[in-house]
Amino acid sequence: GQILLEGQRIDQLPHEQMRHIRGRKIGAVFQDPLTSLNPLYTVGQQLTETIQTHLPVTAAEARKRAISLLEDTGIPAAAQRIDHYPHQFSGGMRQRVVIALALAAEPKLIVADEPTTALDVSIQAQIISLLKRVCQEHGAAVMLITHDMGVIAETCDRVAVMYAGRIAEIGPVHEVIN
């Protein structure tokens, strides 16, 4: 198989070229938001570093964009919370920060690997809804990796069913699930 992004094959690119694609063209949201964030840095430091690494902006512009992303993802009092550390946020709020981080460099694709597994059931639907909304607003496609068929049925247009590392079935959600 091949992995194509915007018509370019990326599965055989050298490490250095992939480094430029990761973050800039592809963002990621992982299972556990606590391990996705560095506990030694504020969420603002992490967001602004990502923004400045991938976009030609000043530190002030990066901070303004970071606050805007936190607001977009539903972090209350984002201008103050930007200076907080990951441990000062709840699990759901940390996952919102991770989603903001994934969107920081305006990627074309967000890979969301079980983004709600580590969260309370009451927060899971909010996070899936948020991910869908902000990706639509920012023009990013989402590749959702999950075992939750309910989430797939409610969220996805197309689905690929994997078995033993291979695609066993692929197609529109309503056809594959039925």
Question: Where are the model-predicted features located?
Answer:
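Short, glycine/charged-rich "phosphate-handling" switch motifs in NTP-dependent
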Residues: 158, 170
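ABC ATPase NBD coupling module
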Residues: 10-27, 45, 53, 175-178
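Helical segment within the ABC ATPase nucleotide-binding domain
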Residues: 125-139, 150
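Conserved ABC transporter NBD signature motif
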Residues: 1-9
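A short, surface-exposed alpha-helical micro-motif characterized by mixed small hydrophobic
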Residues: 152-154
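A short, proline-enriched helix->beta-strand linker immediately N-terminal to the Walker B motif
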Residues: 104-108
